[in-house]
Amino acid sequence: MVVGLLGNKIGMTQIFDESGNIIPVTILKVGPCVITQVKNQSKDGYDSIQIGYGNVLSKALTQPELGHLQKSNIQPLKYLKEFRINQETEFQIGQVLNVDSFTPGQLVNIQGKSIGKGFSGLQKRHNFTRGPMTHGSKNHRAPGSIGMGTTPGRVLPGKKMSGQLGNKITTIKKLKIIQINSEENILVIKGSVPGKPGNLLSIVPSA
């Protein structure tokens, strides 16, 4: 049983299926991930496992991070993430999880930080329609009305306006696994995933 794994986005390409149709796919380098901590209901109030991914020099970690890993006799790891589980008997500290936990055709949810687009306007950020471009109009890409008048006399919270676009945690659900390469720890996913090549991703089975 796999709860979740961490990996990096390598890039996108395309492959052909048995019928000769082109499938756009994303190549992911996933795992191996090491279980660094197992939490249980009696001690921690809930069941979960913490996994680590990505070798790193010890000097790149803080002393609390090093102490946490050394307590379990685990080498320094760059990323740590916790996943909830139903029961803690299946997993042990030091156990290695890799892409063999998944199967071709399985649906997964992939979470990562989207590409940052900087400060963006309403047309780009919220898909607003622009104003007239001719006939004397000066309202081309302006937001237009942003509220009522004297009542309520303020801009209501949550109003769609210009601001930061992207650079936030995004989840793409129910992506299909096309191929698995266990020797190279490669997952081939149908479609696109968040972020640029090299972006850290969390891969969990779809509910």
Curated annotation (Swiss-Prot):
It is found in: Plastid, Chloroplast. It comes from the Eukaryota. Keywords: Chloroplast, Plastid, Ribonucleoprotein, Ribosomal protein, RNA-binding, rRNA-binding. One of its GO terms (cellular component) is chloroplast. Its main location: plastid. Pfam families: Ribosomal_L3 (PF00297). This is Large ribosomal subunit protein uL3c.
